[in-house]
């Protein structure tokens, strides 16, 4: 097994320079073997910018494309529900079940990719404690 190179401390000058250089490069482009729909590209950009550039590997980028698509599908389903309502012909709109499944899939993918709120911001008790300081 190939050892993973040790990362620089987040509070080091080298890490700060790397972060600035990575931010200047903008979002990572999808690899050739990954398809990201045009309408999902802003979602892709937000996802890949949520983690340091040097932490992404090809397997993660594949999952990131699935997450961007799930977010795009969720927006489409929400618009459909807004247009047609939660109830259609006295039954629950089938789009509601699809939206629920897409949301669950997106949450699982976000956790797996470590781009969820707990991974990027911290636990809610820590956020609450930090906001009390402001």
Question: Predicted regions span which residues?
Answer:
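Non-transmembrane, interaction-prone segments in cytosolic or luminal domains
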Residues: 27, 34-43, 58-60, 89, ...
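Arg/Lys-rich, low-complexity, intrinsically disordered N-terminal tails that contact nucleic acids
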Residues: 1-45, 119-134
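Amphipathic alpha-helical protein-protein interaction segments
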Residues: 65-128, 132-134
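An amphipathic, hydrophobic-aromatic interaction surface with interspersed Lys/Arg
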Residues: 30-84
């Amino acid at each position: 097994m190939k050892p993973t190179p040790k990362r620089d401390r987040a509070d080091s000058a080298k890490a700060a320079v790397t972060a600035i250089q990575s931010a200047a490069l903008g979002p990572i482009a999808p690899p050739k073997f990954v398809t990201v729909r045009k309408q999902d590209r802003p979602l892709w950009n937000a996802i890949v910018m949520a983690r340091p550039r040097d932490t992404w590997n090809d397997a993660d980028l594949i999952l990131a494309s699935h997450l961007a698509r799930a977010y795009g599908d969720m927006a489409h389903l929400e618009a459909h529900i807004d247009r047609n309502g939660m109830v259609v012909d006295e039954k629950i709109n089938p789009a509601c079940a699809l939206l629920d499944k897409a949301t669950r899939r997106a949450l699982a993918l976000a956790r797996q990719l470590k781009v969820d709120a707990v991974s990027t911001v911290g636990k809610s008790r820590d956020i609450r404690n930090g906001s009390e300081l402001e």
